[in-house]
């Protein structure tokens, strides 16, 4: 690890330049919140001068150590339906990535990450990890969303299989840190938001001709069972103003075909699509209301981006979702899974545009605490803690 001195306004700062190994099975996708956060972190670390090496699947590139993925069997097949892959750990490739590394950060509790951690420890390289996967992601996609016993078992199992070997866990929300405490995860927990990139801010964007005169409601996220876009579709049909509502669902996923069929009863066809980051900025600034209906969420980058652009959110008050932490008052919360209650909230905001305008300003102000650069600094702080603790052993 080298030390670089930076001089700003006659003040000298020391920047520790690190070789950081990031481990994540999936990196190329932009339809997955965890992958998006990983990509943004890598870019930010490189901009700060760090050398970042990626152990992942996907296409070759600078400082990328590409591994094949499991293709056969039930688990890889089910994972692929949900946009996930599992890498095959190949020791020779992993060893090359670890040469001279200062720190390893693993994203998921999967076989690849576990093997990298084992090899890093053998070489004396400190490791940190993250908790982006909730047990309910497993139970929902297994068709057992109401089985709390199974959810508890999953948390205990991944603790024994993976997390017990780490001393530092990044939690994207206090909710996730509390969940780990509840299931007796002993590692030090760093509550660090994934952060809001500076590109997401208010700007004047006129509605395209086909949307003019309509009340546009947006939800961004994978079209999967736990995201509950079905509740939003039903709520739009129950609204007093259904004929004036244009629903936009941004994302892909296993429930896409089902939601196309479900939305056929709406007066205005739902707009389904996948959008680039720059297009999302325009979309957030063009729409009238943001809804986050998910039952399961460790943070929700899209909701943060929406209110940073001034789009007032209406969020499901699910007990297993962290997103409700962003609600500034009860007008931004609805009963999770309750389409009628969501419809009532939608109607309220259609009928109270001046209140929405005032609340929009407050949401923009509240977004400052999730400044992306500050969040990256906190991640670097966690890495430095792990390195310092290892040096003191």
Regions found by a protein language model. Name each.
Residues 122, 150-168, 183:
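Membrane-proximal helix-turn-helix segments that form the acceptor-binding/catalytic region
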Residues 318, 328-339, 348-353:
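Conserved acidic donor-binding segment of nucleotide-sugar-dependent glycosyltransferases
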Residues 257-278:
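Nucleotide-activated donor-binding/catalytic signature segment of Leloir-type glycosyltransferases, i.e.
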Residues 58, 175, 195:
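Carbohydrate-associated surface elements
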Residues 312-317:
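Short hydrophobic beta-strand element within catalytic cores of glycosyltransferases
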Residues 209-237, 248:
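Conserved donor-binding/catalytic core segment of Leloir-type glycosyltransferases
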Residues 109, 295:
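Aromatic "clamp/platform" in nucleotide-sugar-dependent glycosyltransferases that forms part
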């Amino acid at each position: 690890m080298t030390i670089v001195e930076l001089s700003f306004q006659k003040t000298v700062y020391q920047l520790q330049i690190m070789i950081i190994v990031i481990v994540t099975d999936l990196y190329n996708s932009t339809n997955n919140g965890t992958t998006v956060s990983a990509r943004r972190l890598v870019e930010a670390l490189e901009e700060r001068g760090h050398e970042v090496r990626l152990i992942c699947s996907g296409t070759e590139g600078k400082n990328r150590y590409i591994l094949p993925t499991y293709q056969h069997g039930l688990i890889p097949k089910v994972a692929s339906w949900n946009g996930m892959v599992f890498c095959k750990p190949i020791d020779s490739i992993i060893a090359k990535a670890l040469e001279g590394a200062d720190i390893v950060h693993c994203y998921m509790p999967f076989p690849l990450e576990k093997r990298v951690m084992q090899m890093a420890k053998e070489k004396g390289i400190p490791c940190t990890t993250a908790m982006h996967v909730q047990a309910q992601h497993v139970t929902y996609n297994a068709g057992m969303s109401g089985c709390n016993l199974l959810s508890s078992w999953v948390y205990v199992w991944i603790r024994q299989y993976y997390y017990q070997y780490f001393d530092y866990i990044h939690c994207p929300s206090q909710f996730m840190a509390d969940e780990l405490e509840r299931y007796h995860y002993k590692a030090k927990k760093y509550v660090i938001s994934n952060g809001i990139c500076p590109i997401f801010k208010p700007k004047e964007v006129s509605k395209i001709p086909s949307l003019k005169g309509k009340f546009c409601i947006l939800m961004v996220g994978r079209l999967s069972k736990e995201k509950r876009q079905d509740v939003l579709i039903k709520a739009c049909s129950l609204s007093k103003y259904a004929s004036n509502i244009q629903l936009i669902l941004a994302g892909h996923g296993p429930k896409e075909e089902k939601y196309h069929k479900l939305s056929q009863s709406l007066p205005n066809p739902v707009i389904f699509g996948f959008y680039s980051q720059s297009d999302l900025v325009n979309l957030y600034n063009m729409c009238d209301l943001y809804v986050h209906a998910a039952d399961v969420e460790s943070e929700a980058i899209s909701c943060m981006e929406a209110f940073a652009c001034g789009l007032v959110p209406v969020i499901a008050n699910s007990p297993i979702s962290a997103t409700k932490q962003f609600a500034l008052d009860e007008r931004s919360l609805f009963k999770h899974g309750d389409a009628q209650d969501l419809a009532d909230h939608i109607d309220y905001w259609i009928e109270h545009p001046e209140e929405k305008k005032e609340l929009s300003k407050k949401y923009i102000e509240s977004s400052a605490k999730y400044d992306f650069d500050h969040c990256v600094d906190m991640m670097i702080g966690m890495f430095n803690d792990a390195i310092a603790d290892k040096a003191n052993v």
